[in-house]
Amino acid sequence: MDAKLSPEQGLNISGIALASLLAVGLGTTAFFLDSMANRLPWQSMSLTLPLLLCAMGSGVVGFWVIPLLQALKTGQIIREDGPQAHLKKAGTPTMGGIFFIPVGVIIACILSNFATDVLAVSALTTSYGFIGWLDDWQILRRKSNKGISPRTKLALQVGFAAVFCLWLMFNQPSNITNIALPWVSFTLPLGFLFWPLAGFVLVAESNATNLTDGIDGLAAGTVAIALLALGALIAPTAPGLMVFCAALSGGCLGFLAHNRNPARVFMGDTGSLALGGALAAVALLTNTLVALFILSGIFFVETLSVMAQVSYYKATKGPDGKGKRLFKMAPLHHHLELTGWSELQVVGVFYVIAAILAAICLA
């Protein structure tokens, strides 16, 4: 695709229309998948009911919480060296994860009859949301883009990941350390090596979704697609976690009603870290790491763009202390913006890619 695509060319759609298309698409998909699996869409153990309940619940709660966030002066601090179009977003409330993550988690626990697996994943999700909240709060308190130190954030992420892995170790079958490879009848026995991999996946996935949250509606929409697909994939073997995935996907859709372009609220690290942790925890618990890797394609590309940018800059640094850049700005979505894409073009194309990746996993 031509990187110099102008905002007036190609995708010409409003933020509310794009969000509505996604909501209708995911709702229809959930209904279709339930019907194909002989699940009644209005049953608690389905994809459709949790999706719709949480979409409506988080959407309604947002109308109450957003004015409260505004009153508490939780306005986002915008980087001056970022895309100039983002400067007008200064003051938009952040920390929106505090309302849609709890809605998804609570409804998932209720509909699943407080299944042990759902409670464990909910605890991990909430814990990562707490890390994000600490970071968001420090940024707001200091009125800068510096939250808690990277070392502190990483230590907390690793710590909560270790607790979750210990729970897995003592409460799940020993064959959880065997990685199933889809499309072939083969499993990869990792043994003890599974546990450092599990910790890495939890930390990496949460940070990857965090990096993707840089444009109105981008993270909420792409994660909603990934969660629904993951829920559909694990439905036959883990119905409780299917409900959890559908509920959190619905929570993202309800949040998207307020976060679509132009956004009235941002999810902040409170939301993005929690969502990444949720995806990783479900995948570890259901032996779907390969599917997670595919579903998270956008998040990983965004992360790789940052890693490549930093590495190349350091490798080409001259005597003046300045290096060269591979991208105009990282992550990738900001590079596309600076080459002429509008926010809605980036979001629309990323939604389509996320949907294609989901279809590949469900094929």
Swiss-Prot record:
Family matches, as InterPro entries: Glycosyl_transferase_4 (IPR000715), PNAcMuramoyl-5peptid_Trfase (IPR003524), PNAcMuramoyl-5peptid_Trfase_CS (IPR018480)
Family of this protein: Belongs to the glycosyltransferase 4 family. MraY subfamily.
Entry GO MF terms: metal ion binding; phospho-N-acetylmuramoyl-pentapeptide-transferase activity; UDP-N-acetylmuramoyl-L-alanyl-D-glutamyl-meso-2,6-diaminopimelyl-D-alanyl-D-alanine:undecaprenyl-phosphate transferase activity
Protein's pathway: Cell wall biogenesis; peptidoglycan biosynthesis
Cofactor: Mg(2+)
TM region(s), chain numbering: 13-33, 49-69, 95-115, 119-139, 154-174, 183-203, 224-244, 281-301, 343-363
CDD domains, per database record: GT_MraY
Stored Pfam families: Glycos_transf_4, MraY_sig1
Protein's recorded name: Phospho-N-acetylmuramoyl-pentapeptide-transferase
Keyword Disulfide bond: no
Source organism of the structure: Nostoc punctiforme (strain ATCC 29133 / PCC 73102)
Reaction equations catalysed: UDP-N-acetyl-alpha-D-muramoyl-L-alanyl-gamma-D-glutamyl-meso-2,6-diaminopimeloyl-D-alanyl-D-alanine + di-trans,octa-cis-undecaprenyl phosphate = di-trans,octa-cis-undecaprenyl diphospho-N-acetyl-alpha-D-muramoyl-L-alanyl-D-glutamyl-meso-2,6-diaminopimeloyl-D-alanyl-D-alanine + UMP
Function: Catalyzes the initial step of the lipid cycle reactions in the biosynthesis of the cell wall peptidoglycan: transfers peptidoglycan precursor phospho-MurNAc-pentapeptide from UDP-MurNAc-pentapeptide onto the lipid carrier undecaprenyl phosphate, yielding undecaprenyl-pyrophosphoryl-MurNAc-pentapeptide, known as lipid I.
Top-rank lineage group of the source organism: Bacteria
This enzyme's EC code(s): 2.7.8.13
Membrane topology listed for this record: Multi-pass membrane protein
